[in-house]
Swiss-Prot record:
Its main location: nucleus. This is U6 snRNA phosphodiesterase 1. The active site is at 122 (proton acceptor), 210 (proton donor). Residues 1-13 have a biased composition (Polar residues). It comes from Mus musculus. 3'-5' RNA exonuclease that trims the 3' end of oligo(U) and oligo(A) tracts of the pre-U6 small nuclear RNA (snRNA) molecule, leading to the formation of a mature U6 snRNA 3' end-terminated with a 2',3'-cyclic phosphate. Participates in the U6 snRNA 3' end processing that prevents U6 snRNA degradation. In addition also removes uridines from the 3' end of U6atac snRNA and possibly the vault RNA VTRNA1-1. It is an enzyme of class 4 (lyase). Pfam families: HVSL (PF09749). It is found in: Nucleus. Residues 1-74 are annotated as: Disordered. HAMAP family: USB1. InterPro entries: Cyclic_Pdiesterase, Usb1.
Length: 267
């Protein structure tokens, strides 16, 4: 039996976005002074606490409390000014899609009871990377420029597949994209170019584009492959109007950095 495909999902945030496999690195040419030049320290008067409390730092990322997100543990430590950043195509779940999930989850829980639904749904175009706060807006502008020429398109995600993250600490049930793969590759190519400009980790060489539906802590791929996977696929295939339900319009690319969202409409 082949192992479950790897998928990068981060351990923080409500949507379990792509996992950062490399910590944020300094942008080339920044953060250093020339040899022979000694930086001259400047003295600053201390700011009263009463004033500081009025202006909370805008560089501070979201609070890192694993108890608030299912006990998941960050793969990379939270540091002041570092923001987990993820690029994806959002999918807005309608009532019919929720009905499909209501049929799939109980069946999957017969094999792995600890499975829970994702809080939101998307197709990832990047891994999760660590971006410095002052790079967010320049990075988003580069992304917008690269996305400007892309047309909106339809894709179909109807193949049930089991995924794990690289550390095998979490398992996901997803619907793999069966049509529209070429358009996703084109988008990833441009996202990767933006990543390289900021010395960030690019996406996987042979990505399996998908919408994650449910997840659990730990490696449950052995329990979910085989009989469970077959039964889940039968539910999808036999679900009323599943062909139309799982044909999705990709009309925007979204970037989430910390608790900030940036949307880039496709033409």
């Amino acid at each position: 039996m082949s192992s479950a495909p790897l998928v990068g999902y981060s351990s923080s945030g409500s949507e379990d976005e792509a996992e950062a496999v490399a910590a944020g690195r300094s942008k080339p040419g920044t953060g250093f002074h020339r040899c022979g030049q000694n930086p001259v320290p400047s003295e600053k008067l201390p700011v009263p606490d009463s004033v500081l409390s009025m202006f909370p730092s805008t560089e501070e990322g979201p609070e890192d409390d694993s108890a608030k997100h299912g006990g998941r543990i960050r793969t990379f430590p939270h540091e002041r000014g570092n923001w987990a950043t993820h690029i994806y195509i959002p999918y807005e779940a309608k009532e019919d899609f929720r009905d499909l999930l209501d049929a799939l989850l109980p069946r999957a829980q017969m094999f792995v009871p600890r499975l829970v639904l994702m809080e939101e749904f998307h197709v990832s175009l990047s891994q999760s990377v660590v971006l410095r706060h002052h790079w967010i807006l320049p990075f988003v502008q580069v992304l917008k420029d690269r996305m400007a020429s892309f047309q909106r398109f339809f894709f179909t995600a109807n193949r049930v597949k089991i995924y794990t993250n690289q550390e095998k600490t979490r398992t996901f049930i997803g619907l793999e994209v069966s049509s529209g793969h070429a358009q996703f590759l084109d988008l990833v190519s441009e996202v990767d170019r933006a990543m390289k400009e900021f010395d960030l980790t690019t996406f996987y060489q042979d990505p399996s584009f998908h919408i994650s539906l449910a997840w659990c802590v730990g490696d449950a791929s052995l329990q979910l492959e085989g009989q469970c996977l077959q039964e889940l696929q039968e539910i999808v295939d036999e679900f009323e109007d599943s062909e139309m339900l799982l044909r999705v319009l990709a009309n925007q690319v979204r970037c989430k950095s910390g608790n900030k969202f940036f949307s880039m409409p496709l033409k």
